[in-house]
């Protein structure tokens, strides 16, 4: 699986995720505006955080 990886204001890069079957994109509102995080897997999130998990290469753009 190849996913985009990103922490808030950084530019997204691609990464290989051995053994993973999902990529995710999660976003929430913070004091600086909308915060976006991308990565491998499909983590659990707290209330108020939107998450989209997907199952194809680079699907979390």
Swiss-Prot record:
Major location (coarse): secreted
Organism of this sequence: Naja annulifera (Banded Egyptian cobra)
Cellular compartment(s): Secreted
One of the record's GO molecular function terms: toxin activity
SUPFAM superfamilies the UniProt entry points to: Snake toxin-like (SSF57302)
Top-level taxonomic group: Eukaryota
UniProt note on tissues of expression: Expressed by the venom gland.
Key words of the record: Acetylcholine receptor inhibiting toxin, Disulfide bond, Ion channel impairing toxin, Neurotoxin, Postsynaptic neurotoxin, Secreted, Toxin
Protein name: Short neurotoxin 3
Pfam families recorded: Toxin_cobra-type (PF21947)
Function: Binds to muscle nicotinic acetylcholine receptor (nAChR) and inhibit acetylcholine from binding to the receptor, thereby impairing neuromuscular transmission.
Assigned protein family: Belongs to the three-finger toxin family. Short-chain subfamily. Type I alpha-neurotoxin sub-subfamily.
Coiled coil: none
One cellular component (GO) term of this entry: extracellular region
Bridged cysteine pairs (disulfide): 3-23, 17-40, 42-53, 54-59
């Amino acid at each position: 699986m190849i996913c985009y990886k990103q922490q808030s204001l950084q530019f997204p890069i691609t990464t290989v995720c051995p053994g993973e079957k999902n990529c995710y994109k999660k976003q929430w509102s913070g004091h600086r505006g909308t915060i976006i995080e991308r990565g491998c897997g499909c983590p659990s999130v707290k209330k108020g955080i939107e998450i989209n998990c997907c199952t194809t290469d680079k699907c979390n753009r």
